[in-house]
UniProtKB/Swiss-Prot annotation:
It is found in: Vacuole. It catalyses: Release of a C-terminal amino acid with broad specificity. This is Carboxypeptidase Y homolog A. The gene is cpyA. InterPro entries: AB_hydrolase_fold, Peptidase_S10, Propeptide_carboxypepY, Ser_caboxypep_ser_AS.
Length: 550
């Protein structure tokens, strides 16, 4: 979860007592409902003031109360994101074209001899473009095969950019991983160049080889989503998570159709921050299609926002010295945060019950102002409790500015086929639109029990992060209702040690696991674990995709 607006995210943190949680027992029904929403998800927020007039008295009173507390936040509600300037490249620029309509029209003989589609899903609106990227032209992982391109939905004018890096090791057998950054509204190319990709960008705006890249033993796809993030673009807007699920299913289906040499390998989805929203939806969408060419084996969520009702109860403990690091706030501020917690949790609970923007938006604004503000006003880095925010214009990290400058260069955009006129690491408008559509506190954690029935789920958390801290991630994973809840919650944290290199035996964190569910605490990692602890990050990643814990 990137904090993109000090106005929206100023507040208090919360108490150590575990909050109550309503979990929908019929998680399969919930998953089906979420997936069905995808058809209506590509609709920007419109006519907010007109709709406000039709609210019930109680809902209107809540909005007016929050508006009085935080007028600048509420004034942002009617605004929409502007389309990105772009120039579509001619078909001759691309090496490969895949038509979703043609893929959907492939029929095969079923088990009983009847004709059936080779793959499920509505793909007719989608097309995939791809080109070979010359590694030597960019100086990024020379000798490693790379593809980049766009998933196009021309009906809705959506164009999602991706960049694929083949495994450095054994690409014919190594797994494939989709990586997603959060925000909402932040480019996954920041994850590529700041965290786990084959290169970082130095202060001279030059690529530097990354020995700890996750493509050491896996092929990795970095996807800029939702639309109007990074190199992706659209003439419209998007304001919630469910649309992404169908887009990602289409992207993967068409990509593996064009490049079948990767389709039989194990496939995993990994991401951080607001990807704690994205990943349960995307994985549920994939698993809902019985006939698919996507060999989904697991998901990994790092320092994610997944269950706000539980997680917001752990801002006060983390800020006040109970997360393993010295307190950032004084005793009186910690007490005021305790005092705000019950109101915040009751508002989130109401959002969980209704999932209405008119309930969820006030909850988001109140809780973000009440739960995050005291910490944020100290100037401390919300992504790393150990230091100050060094560059407010780049979300506290100078390196993000280097990445933006590099990816904005015309030569780089030409090399990867980017069609936008520039590059921004994060789109503040998308962040605001998601919040004002009520997506922030939607209970997407209710999809996780359905995932656990079919695939392993890893929740990992760097223990120096504040914004999506390890205390809250541990708490929600233990509170989740699923058949193995009791055994998982009661399991003790055990030492996580390096086993694969010269530092064998070094403690890098703690782990607990039962059935298909695993939680990891990574020592010394902030919001971006692979950046802060590259050795530890690659260690647990390699062992996870190798199947050690499932």
């Amino acid at each position: 979860m990137r904090v993109l607006s000090a106005t929206l995210l100023a507040g208090a943190a919360s108490a150590a007592a575990p909050p109550f949680q309503q979990v929908l027992g019929a998680h399969k029904e919930y998953a089906e409902n979420v997936i069905q929403q995808g058809a209506d998800a590509f609709k920007p927020l419109q006519h907010l003031q007109d709709q406000f007039k039709s609210l019930s008295g109680e809902a209107r009173q809540l909005w007016e109360e929050v508006s009085n507390y935080f007028p600048e936040s509420m004034e942002s509600a009617p605004l929409l994101s502007l389309p990105k300037k772009h120039t579509r490249r001619p078909d001759s620029h691309w090496d490969y074209h895949v038509s979703g309509a043609e893929v959907q029209d492939i029929w095969v003989s079923g088990a009983e001899g009847t004709k059936e589609r080779e793959v499920d899903g509505r793909l007719e609106a989608y097309n995939l473009r791809a080109k070979k990227v010359d590694p030597s032209a960019l100086g990024i992982d020379p000798g490693v095969k790379q593809y980049s391109g766009y998933l196009d939905d021309d009906e809705n004018d959506k164009h999602l950019f991706y960049w694929f890096f083949e495994s450095r090791n054994d690409p014919k057998n190594d797994p494939v991983v989709l990586w997603l950054n959060g925000g909402p509204g932040c480019s996954s190319l920041t994850g590529l160049f700041m965290e786990l990709g084959p290169s970082s960008i130095d202060s001279k705006i030059k690529p530097v080889y990354n020995d700890f890249s996750w493509n050491n033993n896996a092929s990795v796809i970095f996807l800029d989503q939702p639309i109007n993030v990074g190199y992706s673009y659209s003439g419209g807007s998007v304001s919630d998570t469910v649309a992404a699920g169908k887009d990602v299913y289409a992207l993967l289906t068409l990509f593996f159709k064009q490049f079948p040499e990767y389709a039989t390998q194990d496939f995993h989805i990994a991401g951080e921050s607001y990807a704690g929203h994205y990943i349960p939806v995307m994985a549920s969408e994939i698993l809902s299609h019985k006939k698919r060419n996507i060999n989904l084996k697991s998901v990994l969520i790092g320092n994610g926002l997944t269950d706000g009702l539980t997680q917001y109860g752990y801002y006060r403990p983390m800020a006040c010295g109970e997360g393993g690091y010295p307190a950032v706030l004084d005793e009186s501020t910690c007490q005021s945060m305790d005092n705000s917690l019950s109101r915040c949790q009751s508002m989130i609970q109401a959002c969980y019950n209704s999932e209405s923007p008119w309930v969820c938006v006030p909850a988001s604004i109140y809780c973000n102002n009440a739960m995050l503000g005291p910490y944020q006003r100290t100037g401390q880095n919300v992504y790393d409790i150990r230091g100050k925010c060094e560059d407010e214009s780049n979300l506290c990290y100078k390196g993000m500015g280097y990445v933006s400058e590099y990816l904005g260069q015309e030569s780089v955009r030409e090399a990867v086929g980017a069609e936008v006129d520039g590059y921004d690491s994060c789109n503040f408008d998308i962040n605001r639109n998601f919040l004002f559509n009520g997506d922030w506190f939607k209970p997407y954690h209710r999809l996780v029990p359905g995932l656990l029935e079919q695939i392993p789920v890893l929740i990992y958390a760097g223990d120096a992060d504040f914004i999506c801290n390890w205390l809250g991630n541990k708490a929600w994973s233990e509170a989740l209702e699923w058949p193995g809840q009791k055994e998982f919650a009661s399991a003790e944290l055990e030492d996580l040690k390096i086993v694969q290199n010269e530092h064998v035996g070094k403690k890098i964190g703690q782990i607990k696991s039962h059935g298909n569910f695993t939680f990891m605490r990574i020592y010394g990692g902030g919001h971006m674990v692979p950046m802060d602890q590259p050795e530890s990050g690659l260690e647990f990643f390699n062992r996870w995709i190798g199947g050690e814990w499932f």
